UniProtKB/Swiss-Prot annotation:
The keyword Nucleotide-binding does not apply. It comes from Prochlorococcus marinus (strain NATL2A). GO terms for molecular function: 1,4-dihydroxy-2-naphthoyl-CoA thioesterase activity; fatty acyl-CoA hydrolase activity. It comes from the Bacteria. This is 1,4-dihydroxy-2-naphthoyl-CoA hydrolase. The lineage of its organism: Bacteria, Bacillati, Cyanobacteriota, Cyanophyceae, Synechococcales.
Amino acid sequence: MIDRFLDKRNPREWLCLKRTVRFGETDAAGVVHFLELFRWCHETWEESLEKYGIALKDIFPTNEINTSQLDIALPVVHCEANYFQPLYVGDTINIELETEKINESSFVLRFKFKKNGEQIGSTNIKHVSINPITRKKCALSKQINLWLHESSSNF
């Protein structure tokens, strides 16, 4: 359940995250492998939801909850990435998440990757809410709607 104390919090608390590049995230050339940006995006989104106050088990299937027990599923229907500079082991980056609700059943997550204040990459990932049993579009959950609304506040 979402704590009401969040009403007074700054969205930066759950939308701006920091990470360090690890050896296992690099390729044979010693730079971050391209797919890592998408993995980091999903991890950033998950961490953002948790910091906001949404339990991941309420959004994603777990070993205790399968997809059919959830009210909605949020598959990715479009994603794209731009890479402006390589990243290496030990680089510290900031990941900034911006949200945009498209309509009652979809939203876009936009991520900016910054190193030393300079943008070095970006991604856009569009999700659509579907009924996990019928696989048809449906309205976003109350929790996700609230997170999107409060996350879209200028910070």
